[in-house]
Amino acid sequence: SSDGDRNYFASIDNKPNIKIIYLHAKEIIQRLSDGTLDVGISGLDLLNESEKNLQNKIVIKNRLNFGYANLVVAVPDDWIDVQTIADLEEVSFDIRTKRNTRLRVATKYPNLTNNFLISKGVTQYKLIPSLGATETYPFIGSSEIITDITSSGKTLQDNNLRVLKDGLVLKSTACLFISKKKSLKISSFLDSLI
């Protein structure tokens, strides 16, 4: 039940000791890690993007059957010679040599992006933090490429971007998470509800 459009709290009629709080998906990860939330639903991408010390304080109880999305590396459509990460690595060295700068990668996921690019041997880049509308960055001159979360790929396509053939950084989904501070007790309780 809820008491209004602006109310962030709810309850379950036959479970008065359960309190529901509506939070931003990133906030859920933070609150689970510090123990102020016992259980939360958020994205696997947000857990994996968080610092390792936070990840170590959270248990994945279940992967849920909604919220599917992929974190991908996308380049402008007119980069016809860039189809793979290896091609991107070559371009990054060209940019470094010819412009004396680094390939700029706009992203809301700096940790996952950095880990992915380094694991693929791409080293000549600079991350550009994005707070939203990341797809616009290459066309306003703020970056050459992006990494972003996508479900259908339509927004990328509508903005003249395409995913590299081997540009899948992470397959994400909504997950039911538990704070490790109370994981055994909460896990048993959740099992009794389901």
Predicted segments with their positions:
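Domain-level signature for soluble enzymes in the chorismate/prephenate branch of the shikimate pathway
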Residues: S1-I194
